[in-house]
Amino acid sequence: SIAYMKLLLEIGSEVDILSKQLCSIIDCNFNTEQSKMPTYCRTIDRMLPNFRNDSVIIRRKHEFTPWLKVFEHCGNQNAEYSWWQIYNGVKHNRNACEYGNLPTYKMSNQQNVLFALGALFQLEMYYLREVIKLYQLDNQIYPLQPIVSSSLFTLKSMSLYFERQTYSEYLFHDIRVRMI
């Protein structure tokens, strides 16, 4: 539908921007001028090896790995398509029949939008963790300020550290993240 297509375009654009930001934080030599998804994948794989296989959980019931097929496709153009390829197809060539008999824009469906949104959530959590590490915000001098947590998604790699009435703290690869 057109609504899914618009959502996919907006989410995909945010993923592109935040991927570049994450790569520039985790690799001080990252060239932001020459950046595309294959470059992001290589940098993230090298610096954050658990990222591609991390799972996003929807409302504590359904688990999926939104980045796995994206990373596989970055290394092998013949790999099964992912939400990222659909996003690019919609962005650059909406009416082409790149994925079977359907025009690309018809691949803008609930599943691809959900995978894109889960991928964006995962990126945001890793970005937050790297900012906390970079600026050493996980210590006694700078008490963590809570951020609003997602009512839809959680990351499998984030484990509950402790829970209070007003917020919860999670351990995310040894970094504390406080969420409301």
Language-model features and meaning:
Residues 1-9, 74-81, 104-111:
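Short, solvent-exposed segments of well-ordered alpha helices
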